[in-house]
């Protein structure tokens, strides 16, 4: 976070911006998110794996005025990491719990998309990347835009060399 503020958490004092979800390592960079409440600030970080030296930080997406999932409401909200981060050649993907994952440019940290209201009742903390898609909550979303591409049904998904396998039952 932006300073050393602490608060009680799990019977001890913790950062007001604790690391959230699971970090992802790709090539020589570690990506992770920190912060719980969008209004207090959420930060997506990229660090050089060997030294811990910051490559970039995105601090702009924790509190954005965006459409909310309840009928025409707009309010300050934003990306809040809830799940294991994903990365590919171009993007860092941040699962956000009850909303479709957010995307950031992997090289610069620039925010690309987050659709809180648009895909109502879709989203989840478990996500996967396969080809040009983000698999999340029984759906495939285009990784370039975050737009819904297909609904494949709920159940565990796994990426295979020839596509996606989904379990049911």
Please report, for each region that a protein language model flagged, where it lies by residue:
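Beta-propeller blade signature
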Residues: 42-53, 101-105, 109
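Hydrophobic, small-residue-rich alpha-helical packing segments that form membrane-like cores
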Residues: 1-3, 9, 21-25, 46, ...
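Short linear interaction motifs
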Residues: 4-9, 73-77
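Repeat-blade elements of multi-bladed beta-propeller folds
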Residues: 14-44, 70-101, 115, 119-143, ...
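Beta-propeller fold detector
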Residues: 1-3, 7, 55-63, 68, ...
């Amino acid at each position: 976070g932006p300073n050393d503020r602490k608060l009680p958490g799990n019977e001890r004092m913790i950062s007001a911006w604790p690391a959230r979800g699971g970090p992802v390592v790709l090539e020589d960079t570690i990506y992770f998110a920190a912060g719980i409440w969008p209004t207090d600030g959420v930060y997506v970080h990229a660090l050089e794996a060997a030294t811990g030296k910051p490559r970039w930080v995105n601090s702009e997406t924790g509190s954005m005025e965006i459409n909310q999932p309840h009928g025409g409401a707009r309010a300050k909200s934003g990306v809040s990491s809830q799940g294991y981060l994903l990365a590919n050649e171009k993007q860092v993907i941040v699962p956000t719990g009850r909303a479709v994952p957010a995307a950031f440019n992997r090289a610069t940290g620039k925010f690309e998309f987050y659709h809180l209201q648009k895909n109502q009742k879709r989203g989840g903390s478990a996500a996967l990347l396969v080809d040009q898609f983000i698999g999340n909550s029984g759906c495939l979303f285009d990784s370039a835009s975050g737009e819904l591409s297909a609904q494949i049904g709920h159940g565990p998904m796994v990426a295979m060399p020839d596509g996606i396998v989904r379990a049911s039952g």
